[in-house]
Amino acid sequence: MVALFVVATIIVFLVIDYFVQRAAKRKAALAPAAHVSAKPRFVIPKGYFFGKGHTWVELLPDGLTRVGVDDFVQKIIGPVSAVELLPANTVVQKGDRLFTLRQGGKEVSFRAPISGKVVGINDDLVHSPGVVRKEPYKEGWVLLIEPTNLAADIKQLSIGNEAALWLREEIKRFRNFITAQTEVPAASGSALPAGVTLMDGGAPVNDVMEHSPQEIWQRFETDFLTAGNGKKSANS
């Protein structure tokens, strides 16, 4: 009798454990992922679309889109001292200059990932530009755009795993780019300072461009922020 009681008790616990585990697995399957990451240090939030010029687009319920700069760029350029924004009601075409981040006397400009009209700006960035660095996907958003050709433009953006794969390739490309800059003859005045290195695994260290001259910032803009946006020159 005792043996039967023990066996019955074990069976009861096994059944309870089965349903607990099943419920936990179901909950995990239904819970939304916080983000996908190309590397642990570079975040790609779920549901955000990414342009080739390292801007992101978030579709809002009211039909507007929120635009900002991705985690990759804000980490490698370092602290932001000022943000230059287009005024509200400005009409932009995909690939037009949209906003500029400054660090002292250096700057890089970002292109519009979609066409539309600027209907709002993040005023907080005027007084606290560092928010772009702290919260690039939330409080650090840059502009609100009312899209005019979203159906076509969105096809040229990436999302989720596709965006993560693209960013991995961008990290590799940046590694080659920054390595080439360290090999520029010092006499040219545009080489990276001694001691700037990359972490193992191909990912750049934070702030790797902070102490580089404007010439390298300009090359970075041309190679990474302008390419793929329909503009031939970073100055257009």
Model segments located where?
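Contiguous, well-folded functional domains in the mature portion of proteins
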Residues: 1-236
